[in-house]
Amino acid sequence: LFRSVLDGKVGLEMAKRLEGKGILMLASMEGGFRNMINNKKPVSSPADVSGVKYRVMQNPVFIDMFNSMGGSAVPMAWGETFTAVQQGTIDGLEIPLAVIDASKYFEVTKFLSLTNHTYSAIHLLVSKRTFDKLSPDQRKAVVDAAKQSLAEQRKASADNARQLVATLQSK
């Protein structure tokens, strides 16, 4: 579904708007889905967020989303988050599986809930001015490399997500 959005009309409109700002979008890669981890309870429905203090990005959309589900959104700088979970200042947070694993959040949280509540795209962008300075052969090589890397990155992202689910659920 998300790939069809990024590769379809929405993605084309986004690319068109960016180009109007002097930026070319070469590809929309996957950052994966964000999931919830906490020390209070598993989350299988929005109602389960109620009563749980979640670290969220300092962004009104995320703050409103968690507060509207009955949780307590705690905007917090990323660098403070691990210690805040460890000390009980917050109960949990929402992040991609790869970050849960790499940052070892499984060591300080009890519940991993595969909520997939937010999808993160990673856009491969280049300045139009810089791109236009390249020779036609160089431009073709850049576009071809972007297309090839897109397919490889999306496959690797999906494979990595499957592996991380198994790894994290075993911890």
Model-derived regions: residue spans:
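N-terminal secretory/targeting leader peptides
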Residues: 1-2, 9-171
